[in-house]
Amino acid sequence: MLSRREVLMMAPLSAAALRQSTRSRAGAAQPSTPVTFEVPAGACDCHTHVFGDPGRFPFTPNRTYTPESASVDEMRALHRALHTTRVVIVQPSVYGTDNACTVDAIKQLGPGARGIAVIDDQTPDTKLDEMDRDGIRGIRINLATAGQTDPELGRRRFDAAVTRIGRRKWHVQMYTQLSVIEAMQKQIAASPVPVVFDHFGGAQAAGGPTQRGFDVLLDLVRSGRAYVKVSAPYRGSTAAPDFADMGPLAKALIAANVRRILWGTDWPHPDTTPGRASTEISPLRQIDDGRVLNQFGSWASPSERKSILVDNPRELYGF
């Protein structure tokens, strides 16, 4: 959850300028490899984003990157190819606390869609109630995209998010590093609401299951105190295009507690790598999600796949 001070400078970007800069975009990737296992009915992609028309949904000027657009229709094509019928749309950092694009996408997709919002300390409870009716099921704390590694910042945002959730059937979703999770272990273990970690909890393939902090992540999963998304394996891998080197991490998480594992694509795969000006268009990564889903299938048995793809999302997001 962002503080009011952090979003005070937010203002719409010139839509005309942004449209001019996105005319020759590569486009959001679509799977080129067929899925080779039987995807269970009701399977859910638990981590996606939508980047809409900048004239209608302007980016915040203090973002760290500027993505190409990725539409609801393109997302529908993705999920037809993957044989997934449910989806969770996660509010990306480029929109700050303006969740309009995310909520609009949920409404377009209907009852098979849920969402995760970003809020600040000025977001009124009436707005949270409205978003709850619209399908929002959690609050995202994104520390990683801006390179924030201070555990104290994580603690403050976590406490604020839990307080705002109140009695709603929501959870806290965190995108951060293992070092922050390790420092926040006691706080997370005592949380009155579910906690979800994005993208393998920030674990890196090169470190393997013995890397510092991964044991803490496993303990939180094992005890049922946290969920982990085995999503966006390319963020921790050096073995494109299948990202097989993330297998030991995925298998360790599944073995710890299959009922606390989720799967997601991270489509349309925004490239948040530092080095560009924040207003320069960052081309979407061309990830073959068919290959990625097949790789996940090699890490889990059919019964484990059903838990991860169907049962766990149904319970957490209320499908």
Identify the role of each PLM range.
Residues M1-S14:
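N-terminal secretory signal peptides and thylakoid transit peptides that target proteins
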Residues S71-E74, T123-T126, I181-E182, P209-L217:
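Alpha-helical scaffolding within the catalytic cores
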Residues A26-P34, T210-F319:
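H/E-rich (His + Asp/Glu) clusters that bind or coordinate divalent metals
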Residues V94-S179, K186-A189, R222, Y227-P241:
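Active-site gating/metal-coordination segments in enzymes
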